[in-house]
Structures are given as C-alpha cells and as structure tokens.
Curated annotation (Swiss-Prot):
Entry's localization field: Vacuole
Gene3D superfamilies attached to this UniProt entry: TolB, C-terminal domain (2.120.10.30)
Keywords: Glycoprotein, Phosphoprotein, Signal, Vacuole
Disulfide topology: none
Tissue specificity as recorded in UniProt: Expressed in cauline leaves and flowers.
Induction text: By salicylic acid (SA), jasmonic acid (MJ), ethylene, abscisic acid (ABA), dark and infection with the fungal pathogen A.brassicicola and cucumber mosaic virus (CMV).
Record organism: Arabidopsis thaliana
Region forming the signal peptide: 1-23
Primary residence: other
Sites bearing Phosphotyrosine, chain numbering: Y303
Protein name: Protein STRICTOSIDINE SYNTHASE-LIKE 5
Family to which this protein belongs: Belongs to the strictosidine synthase family.
Length: 371
C-alpha cells in the first residue's frame, strides 16, 4: 500500500507537470533566434581601473514617493531643474539642492503616454521620446505639446525610447523595437531578433529618416561634443557603437561591458556615463547562448513566473574614445536606466523605484580595485 501511494504521488506531482511543460513548450509559437556571440561572451573586456561596488552605501534618494519610475533625466542648468518622465505619464520637474530633502517635485506636463527619453531643443523646448506616443515637442513652458513623428518608412514606432539633439536642431532617437511595446520588452530581448532602429527627425523639413535598422534593442543615444557622430547602445549585445553622421558608417565604441547598457549621457567634461540596467550574470549569458532556455523563460513569463533576475546595476564612466574610467555599481541595485553627472553628484534614473538615486562622487569616490 505505501508503495502504491508513493507511485501515484510521483506520477501526479512529477510526471504530469513534466508532460504539461513539454506540451506547453511544443505548442508555444514563441521562436527565439540564435544571437551573435557578443551577447553571451563570458568575459568582461571593458574593465575600468576605478571601482565603487557599494553604490547604495552613500546614496541619497530624491522625491521619494513622488517620482514613479523616473526613467531618464535631463538637467536644465539655467533654472537648476531636473526633468524626468514617470510611468504615470507625467514629465516632472525637480529642483536641485545640496540637501536631497530640500528637493521639490512639480507635476509639469502629462503626455498621456509613457515619457522615456528627455532632451532640450535648441529653442528651449523639451523633446520627449514617449514609448507610446512617439517623438513629442513640449513648448510654451508646458502649454503646448506637439507630436513630431510616430512612424518611419511606413512602420509605426512601437517603443520610442531615447532622444538626443544636435546643435543644428536635428533630433536623433531610437525606436527600441518595431515589434514589441514597452510592456513586452522582455520578449524582444528573449526573442533575440534585431527589431531596433536609429533615426533622425529634421524639424525644418519635418522628414524622419531611418539611419540604421536591424539593431538589437536600440537604446541610449548621445551626440558627440564635436557633433560628428552619435553613440548608441544595444542592450543585449553589451556594446555601444559610433554612427558617423556624414559618412553614414558604424564602428564599435565600447563592447564587453560589465552589464546591459541603457541610456548614455555626455557630461560636457570629456566623459560619457553609461547606465547598466543589470550586471552581466552567468544565467543571463547562458540564456542568450541557448535559444531553448530563452523560450522556457518566455513561456514562464507569460504565466507570471520570472526566471531571470536583474541585479548589480550601475553606471560606467568612459572617456571620448570609449576607454573605461570608473564603474559605480552595487549587487543590491537593479533597473538603473540613466546616469548623469550634475556638479559633484551622480544622479540615476530607474524603472523600479519611486525616486531618483544620487551619489556624492567626492565623498564616495571609486577606488583602484578589481571588478
């Protein structure tokens, strides 16, 4: 009798779930593709000499409870205000003070979508890459919101992500994926197919051009200080590349990053700051290498089970040639989407918390140590 119940238990709680899992795998139409080897390279080649691996130890939190997932940050020096976009559709303005507790948060403009990338136009307007709306122009101190573009070459944007503004007024931006929306980001990464595009919009001619296509989740964009090229990031590839505007050619800027890049910001002082939404873990690398693991992960996600976890996020400082200088990260940190240096502080946006994270770089400098 004990043997009978033991066998039945084994059948119902082991064999049946296994058979159901196999059936779900076979029937699911999600079809991940093999990806280039850069996506699962085991080594981190871009290792900076200076490391700060306890970012949260000295961190301050700005706008706690008032900034719901502030994804990108733009700083307006004349007014000493930070502009950031939140998940509730609000572009908010935050005053910058020596004390984080003195910061004041203002609901400025609601786009009715999900504002992500933010930049300032040449005439003082605020340009917003809205994940659902497209590229927006906010002018008249927030009184007027205009849609600039939401499609290119007959293909609608699915995930307008980041925008950078050239000195001549041309806007450069990414549609991270023409197939998946913001709520489906994980499936774009797991599918392993290049759905991203780098584009430009000329406000004078109103023409939208596709500069590059077939990018792997095209994310952050930054204009070079000499205005000759852009730096753009491909998140799953762990690399950032240069796009030369006049020559229309591409070359690698930095690769083998310690994490998965999101936004990239130039600080006006010879450095770019690359946000890492998560560190590069062994589990992530294995999943990128083997499509069947990505399919299992995607099926689980459809049923509300997360098999992939994000941790050890941070911000990498590099010079104009892509040489790594310092890395500020923390094992407890995740979903960091933006890093921008304002004065002596590093401000970080994210898609997890209800605040902006700030670190005093003079009080908590990176030190010489191994990554």
């Amino acid at each position: 009798m004990p043997m009978f119940y033991s066998s039945r238990f084994l059948f119902f709680f082991t064999i049946v779930p296994l058979l159901v899992s196999i059936a779900l795998y076979q029937l699911d139409t999600f079809d991940p593709a093999p990806v280039p080897s850069e996506a699962y390279a085991s080594s981190t080649t871009s290792i900076p000499p200076l490391i700060s691996d306890k970012y949260l130890t000295g961190a301050e939190f700005i706008g706690v409870g008032l900034l719901d997932k502030p994804e990108d940050i733009a700083y307006h020096q004349d007014s000493n205000l930070i502009y950031t976009g939140c998940i509730d559709g609000w572009v908010k303005r935050v005053s910058v003070h020596d004390s984080a507790n003195d910061s004041v948060v203002e609901d400025w403009v609601n786009t009715g979508g999900r504002p992500l990338g933010i930049a300032f136009g040449v005439h003082g307007e605020v340009i917003v890459a809205d994940a659902y709306k497209g590229l927006l122009n906010i002018s008249g101190d927030g009184k007027k919101t205009e849609l600039l573009t939401d499609q290119a070459e007959g293909v609608k944007f699915k995930l307008t992500d980041v925008v950078a503004v050239a000195d001549n007024g041309v806007l450069y931006f990414t549609d991270a994926s023409y197939k998946y929306t913001l709520h489906q980001v994980k499936f774009d990464i797991l599918e392993g197919k290049p759905h991203g595009r780098l584009m430009s919009f000329d406000p004078t001619t109103r023409v939208t051009r596709v500069l590059l296509k077939d990018l792997y989740f095209a994310n952050g964009v930054s204009m070079s200080p000499d205005q000759t090229h852009l730096i753009f990031c491909e998140t799953p590839m762990r690399r950032c590349s240069k796009y030369y505007i006049n020559e229309e050619r591409v070359e690698v800027f930095i690769q083998g990053l310690p994490g998965y890049p999101d936004n990239i910001r130039y600080d006006g002082d010879g450095h770019y700051w690359i946000a890492m939404v998560s560190g590069a873990s062994t589990l992530w690398r294995l999943s990128m290498k083997y499509p069947f693991l990505r399919k299992i992960t995607a099926i689980a996600a459809k049923y509300g089970v997360e098999l992939m976890f994000m941790k050890n996020a941070g911000v990498l400082q590099v010079d104009l040639d892509g040489n790594p200088i310092a890395y500020y990260h923390d094992q407890r940190l995740s979903h960091i989407t933006t890093g921008i240096k304002i004065g002596n502080y590093l401000y970080c946006g994210n898609i997890l918390h209800s605040y902006i994270i700030r670190l005093d770089l003079l009080k908590y400098p990176a030190q010489k140590k191994k990554l």
